[in-house]
Amino acid sequence: MGTLWVNGNIYTLNKPGEMMRAMFVEHGRILKMGEEGHLRRTYAGRIEEIVNLEGKSVYPAFTDSHIHLVGYGEALDRVDASEATNLRELLETMKQQGSDDDWVVAEGFDDRLLGEMPTRDMIDEVISDRPVVLKRVCRHVAVVNSKGLERLGLIHHTVIEGGKLGRDDEGKLNGVLYDAALDLLYKELSGNRKKNAASLRRAIDSLFAHGIVGAHTEDLFYHGDPLETIQAYEDVLGEMPFQAHLLVHEQVVDRVIQHDAMTKRKRFDFGAMKLFVDGSFGGRTALLSAPYADDRGQRGIEVHRPDHLEALVKKARTYGMNVAAHVIGDAAVEQFVSLLEKYPAKKGTRDRIIHASLLNDSLIKRIKSLPVLIDAQPVFLSDDLDMLFERLGNERVHDVYRFKSLLDTGALLLGGSDAPISSVDVRKGLFGAVARQSFKGSSTLNPSERLSMYEALRSFTYSPHVATGTHGRNGLLIQSYNANFTVWDEDFFTLQGEDILHNRLAMTVVEGKPVYEAEVVTS
């Protein structure tokens, strides 16, 4: 017995413009699509329920192709600093925070909104009795107070390879940590099986409410023993209908493989070895070929020495793994592309270029010759556009987030959020991809790089499943595919500009069953 969904604009995303009015779902699969009358007659004895979609629009359910699920769940339970405009008020809020441990944590501050970069002295003025950490929105920079420095064992002469410790005018540590220096924080703030499971449940509930039913995630380094984190996934995905694809951080890959922990489970599997080549534009740690426009003495940070980076790629190949690399600056992309050319992926597989934020024509031409996935976050463009002009200048900024050029190379373009760094709201990702404007309103940046709405939607639906080899039954709304879909009040294909951001999600459905409902649409 099944459910007949009728009176909808049901977009298959199998090809542009293909839309059906009704579909019959049974045992979690789409049995048939077409006109309501025909389906009523064909399945007359098997229709248990009829759902009237009331003219709403239906799309395949979304997959976030770049997220940190455990970290996102943690952030939902911590002080949200993303909208903070006054540092002292933020710290006073943090001072009242209750926690299971003694660290006081705030997530996602933006020094541009605060009007200043926090330092340990500023934090000490409000909270000096407990260790405090403020994580910048990019999560490549964090600030701790004096207690935090003490807890991390950081002293004046400490040197961090692949990272940096901020200093004041007198050369003393000012509490600002960059890139690899944050690894010490991860160890201090690490979770366990129970805590990580709670974070996962919190994250998945939130994702369902955004139409997201699957994710490509990277969590195994930051939250304690990677084997316990894998156990947390087993606990949660044994009870929640969510599909996860786990990348494996290079610092834990040996342990995970030695314990034979990468066996595919029903609702999650494992992918490439993840590594970082550089940092972020916001922290001026993305690796550039020319200096930052607003800091001529800075070109960014190499997280790994070139010989170490090469050794990591060789290690992945020894393990028979693909490589997924965080590369934002053009110099970082060039380093990684050179290594992929030197150590090609196994035939029939693809490496993953994460972010690929700043690309000249030469790099795009080289990428065209490689079997790669482009792991893109269109929301970054709209979040950061004003800052990008500051960091890169008026000319170089036109080479950022070249989505259309990358798609035209034949590379598989994936849409994601990098939450908790940016919002999981897919509407924001679609807006960034098709409008290429700031959320605050601006002219279009390099309009030739805009995606069509069809291309943008596919990057969040079908393409993520192609990347993981699960596209035979997922990512489209066609006969025999899993009945995973979202129902929206308005039609994304008719919306322009900011109207995209205001479309309302009515329902998220997994295997034919609602997992989120904003309103009852059953008649």
Go through each PLM region and give its residues.
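Divalent metal-binding segments
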Residues: 2-7, 11, 15-26, 30-257, ...
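A cytosolic small-molecule/anion-sensing beta-strand core signal
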Residues: 6, 26-27, 277, 481, ...
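Short alpha-helical functional segments enriched in proximate histidine and acidic residues
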Residues: 97, 206, 466-467, 515
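Acidic (Asp/Glu)-rich catalytic clusters
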Residues: 237, 260-268, 367-369
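Non-cysteine beta-strand/loop elements that form the S-adenosyl-L-methionine
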Residues: 268-285, 372-382
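His/Asp/Glu-enriched, well-ordered alpha-helical/loop segment
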Residues: 314-324, 331-351, 356, 361-365, ...
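Glycine- and charge-enriched low-complexity intrinsically disordered segments
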Residues: 517-523
